[in-house]
Structures are given as C-alpha cells and as structure tokens.
Amino acid sequence: MLVPKRVKHRREFRGKMRGYAKGGDTISFGEYGLQATTSHWITNRQIEAARIAMTRYMKRNGQVWIKIFPHKSYTAKAIGVRMGSGKGAPEGWVAPVKRGVVMFELGGVDEATAREALRLASHKLPVKTKFVKRGEA
C-alpha cells in the first residue's frame, strides 16, 4: 500500500477542495486514463483496490500508472471519546484529488480492455470519473 516514507508533520490541517486541478490533468504516460469529475479524498486502500481490479481484469497485460499519491494524513479520535483534549491520532493516508485530475493511466492494451478495466477501477473510488484518451484530456 502507498504511504509516505517520512513526513515533516504527523498531523495536517484538512484544507479546502475548491476549484479545478492546477496540474496532473493530462495523460502523460499511457494511452488511456481515468479522470476525476468531482473532488474528494482518496485513501491508500481505495487506490490499491482500484489497482488490483485493473490488473486482474487485464490479466497482467499492459501497464498501469498511478498518478496520485496519498501524502496527507488524516486523524480520528477513538469511539466514545468526548470532545476536546487535543486532536486525534493519525488514522491513515489520503490523496486529495480535485476534479480534472487523471488518477490512473493504462497502456499496452486495446481500447475496449482499457475502458472495462478503468470502469471496474472506478467502482472502487469515491469520485465520479470519466474515461479519457491521449490528446483529449
């Protein structure tokens, strides 16, 4: 699973998810991509589940590029703990994805296979997505 090797601060502010992506909105490695049309936090477990869904469908043919990385930690307090007494312990890692970001890219397979593999991956993600080809995104 994807996690940072080391971070400067264990706990981060939540931040804002307004507007479109400033970068990462084009296909740069493969021929086909999965582009987010809404903004959301995507956990490292969701990224891994999407990767497994794609590679299993393609039967190890072609190549998958993951273009997002979960660099932001999120915290949670234990169940039954009252408010106050500081921020909770780090719970996991997320990748803040804005709309317009190409999250996954595929290459080395035909369009029908890529479309179906990315459709299966999109069911594992909490964002609405669309299939894009090189030159379109």
From Swiss-Prot:
Stored InterPro entries: Ribosomal_uL16, Ribosomal_uL16_bact-type, Ribosomal_uL16_CS, Ribosomal_uL16_dom, Ribosomal_uL16_sf
One cellular component (GO) term of this entry: cytosolic large ribosomal subunit
SUPFAM superfamilies with a match to the protein in the record: Ribosomal protein L16p/L10e
UniProt KW keywords: Ribonucleoprotein, Ribosomal protein, RNA-binding, rRNA-binding, tRNA-binding
Family label: Belongs to the universal ribosomal protein uL16 family.
NCBIfam families to which the protein is assigned, alphabetical: rplP_bact (TIGR01164)
Protein name: Large ribosomal subunit protein uL16
Organism per entry: Lactococcus lactis subsp. lactis (strain IL1403)
Gene that this sequence comes from: rplP
